[in-house]
């Protein structure tokens, strides 16, 4: 029957000091919630249930975008993790597989770790808990074990001195048969210091029924939870450090690794070169051999082999650069395709457009794509030349091997092989400049004498 993924995302996150629900704060270009969903996808879940609470409407809207197949259930009162899991009973009614409990504010659990938990279940453990050896166990719940058996989980505030001396700690992540887990959480008590229903108490309850519980240990860094802006900033730094190291190992040249910023889904091919101060937003693929020069910002775009971007370029969602294209300094590309060998080298905006093979777009060219209500497309054919400071008023098409004269405002289609000229004819007035400047200086002198 597969695995049901339960993501707990109901917490208020008051220490974030924000109107935005904690799980929607961005990390590496994606909300915290997305990271747990991304890791859980490694198990190919048959069902996804997200438990919402604080800011439920916003979290549910985000969930619909991140995982349209997910079911959202609300925890109207935040009475603990066990109570949160209990809210999934209806959504998981009749589900015959395992349930994996993850947390919307714990973004670094790796797919490999979750697969190890699944392997422990397959090896005979009825319940599997993810643990870690903490450098500073202080506030974490402790895992009390006997050999390879997990006996119970004790929250720090309820632990004895001997239990507090343990350094094997609880991450909160758990896997068990879904119906067994739901039965156990339904029987929990809130007789503890916080008057909450702890998911951790299901281990002792399960052992009382003869269930076997085991621990899978992961690096402490994977269990980092986000509760404050400081922790969020630290998590961003940790993610970027890992992403930079991975890129270098994969054969990417980073001119200044410390100033390169990746998103969680950035894909960069071997032998690509990334200059200093480059920022990758979500949804970027850069193929092998491409070059991204300094101070460029990319999101939602595809850069093909041999393409060159920047410096100081911006690629927005929908930008598609074919092989050996050039996008130069202070150029913005949005929802536009550049065919092989096309060049837009200076000071231009290209939006909602298609530029043909080997065409050249001169400095200062603008596609005027927005009429105040609707967006319109511009098409430029192959091997065409767009003169500097051209305005292309969409919808409009420039044919193959066509040209525009410098400063032209194009409002009609240009046939193949034609040149468009649309500007005021220059008129020279002999001697006018000297007369005009003499007049202005006289006015200035008269004004100063007053």
From Swiss-Prot:
Pathway: Nucleotide-sugar biosynthesis; UDP-N-acetyl-alpha-D-glucosamine biosynthesis; N-acetyl-alpha-D-glucosamine 1-phosphate from alpha-D-glucosamine 6-phosphate (route II): step 2/2; Nucleotide-sugar biosynthesis; UDP-N-acetyl-alpha-D-glucosamine biosynthesis; UDP-N-acetyl-alpha-D-glucosamine from N-acetyl-alpha-D-glucosamine 1-phosphate: step 1/1; Bacterial outer membrane biogenesis; LPS lipid A biosynthesis. Mg(2+) binds at residues 105, 227. It is an enzyme of class 2 (transferase). Acetyl-CoA binds at residues 363, 369-370, 388, 406, 423. Residues 251-450 are annotated as: N-acetyltransferase. Its cofactor is Mg(2+). One of its GO terms (molecular function) is glucosamine-1-phosphate N-acetyltransferase activity. Residues 1-229 are annotated as: Pyrophosphorylase. Pfam families: Hexapep (PF00132), Hexapep_2 (PF14602), NTP_transf_3 (PF12804). Catalyzes the last two sequential reactions in the de novo biosynthetic pathway for UDP-N-acetylglucosamine (UDP-GlcNAc). The C-terminal domain catalyzes the transfer of acetyl group from acetyl coenzyme A to glucosamine-1-phosphate (GlcN-1-P) to produce N-acetylglucosamine-1-phosphate (GlcNAc-1-P), which is converted into UDP-GlcNAc by the transfer of uridine 5-monophosphate (from uridine 5-triphosphate), a reaction catalyzed by the N-terminal domain. This is Bifunctional protein GlmU. It comes from Dinoroseobacter shibae (strain DSM 16493 / NCIMB 14021 / DFL 12). The gene is glmU.
